[in-house]
């Protein structure tokens, strides 16, 4: 008989009960168990820096926001319409002694991306770090089931938004600034039921590498993170109860990761600790070996 523990981060089994949410990108407060977003340690590596994080209300985005706040950064939190999750994230930021603002809206729209950057600079006076993290996914068993509407929505949210918001941010970024893009393990190994999503994540890898070369002479570093199965609101809002029950079992570590286990990658890439890295990806994926 297998011993069952409570904390997924110290367990090799899957502790996620069957569950499903109807709307994307999902509500964190409705998840069981709640994802673990807060890291314990901080070293003020981002002191006096201003960071903009898209999809920052919950999941990996929330964990990144909180990790940045603990490291001394002030944060602008861009999110779609998950107001309750966003308000909680802002409260946690303020509890950690940092300042934050909430900017709701759809980053697949170019005009809104410009607004997000303008609001960030208006409130904080500058922008040092951009984290492109917003994303959506809609599983389909067959390519024929992917509608034109779904295809456009997935690409507009996952990759078009990165072009739009980065274009808006670049006039404010300077030497020493950092851009960190969220990709996925699916960019490297594909996914039979997330064909359009995996395609956008592959595009993000190419975007990151190309942009890093383009901006290297300006002293702006561009890197990315390609997580494996992480317990975020996108999971119960994407998959059936049965799929959620199995989520994360297939990686060598035998469990899904917590958002806080990914956040340190973003802190590293945003800070001077990674000053000799650009065009690179980190892979917190539970031990899956991939060809990078």
What are these regions (language model features)?
Residues 166, 200, 208:
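Active-site helix of classical SDR
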Residues 6, 11-16, 31, 38, ...:
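Short C-terminal tail/terminal secondary-structure segment
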Residues 144-163, 180, 204, 253:
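Catalytic Tyr-X3-Lys loop
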Residues 171, 213-217, 275:
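Alpha-helical segment proximal to the catalytic Tyr-Lys
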Residues 124, 163, 172, 255-284, ...:
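C-terminal substrate-recognition "lid" of short-chain dehydrogenase/reductases
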Residues 193, 217, 229-251, 291-292:
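A glycine/serine/threonine-rich, flexible loop-to-helix segment
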Residues 10, 114, 122, 137-152, ...:
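Conserved mid-core segment of classical short-chain dehydrogenase/reductases
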Residues 184:
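Residue(s) in the substrate-gating loop at a strand-loop-helix junction
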């Amino acid at each position: 008989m297998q011993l069952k523990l409570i904390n997924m981060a110290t367990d090799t089994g899957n502790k996620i009960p069957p569950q499903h949410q109807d709307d994307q990108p999902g509500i964190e407060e409705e998840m069981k168990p709640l994802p673990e977003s807060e890291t314990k340690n901080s070293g003020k590596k981002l002191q006096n820096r201003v960071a903009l994080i898209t999809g920052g209300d919950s999941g990996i985005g929330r964990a990144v926001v909180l990790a940045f706040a603990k490291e001394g950064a002030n944060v602008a939190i861009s999110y779609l319409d998950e107001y309750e999750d966003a308000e909680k994230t802002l409260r946690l930021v303020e509890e950690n002694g940092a300042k934050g603002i909430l900017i709701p809206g759809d980053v697949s729209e170019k005009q809104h991306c410009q607004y997000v950057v303008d609001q960030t600079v208006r409130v904080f006076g500058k922008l040092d770090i951009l984290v492109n993290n917003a994303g959506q996914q809609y599983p389909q068993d067959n390519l024929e089931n992917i509608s034109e509407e779904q295809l456009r929505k997935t690409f507009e949210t996952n990759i078009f938004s990165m072009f739009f918001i980065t274009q808006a941010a670049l006039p404010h970024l300077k030497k020493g600034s950092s851009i960190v893009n969220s990709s996925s393990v699916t960019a490297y190994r594909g996914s039979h039921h997330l064909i359009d999503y995996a395609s956008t994540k592959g595009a993000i890898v190419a975007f990151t590498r190309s942009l890093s070369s383009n901006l290297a002479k300006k002293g702006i570093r561009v890197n990315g993170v390609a997580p494996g199965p992480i317990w975020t609101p996108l999971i119960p809002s994407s998959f059936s109860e049965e799929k959620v029950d199995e989520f994360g079992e297939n990686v060598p570590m035998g469990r899904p990761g917590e958002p806080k286990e990914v956040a340190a990658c973003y802190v590293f890439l945003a800070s001077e600790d990674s000053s000799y890295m650009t065009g690179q990806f980190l892979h917190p994926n539970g031990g899956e070996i991939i060809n990078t």
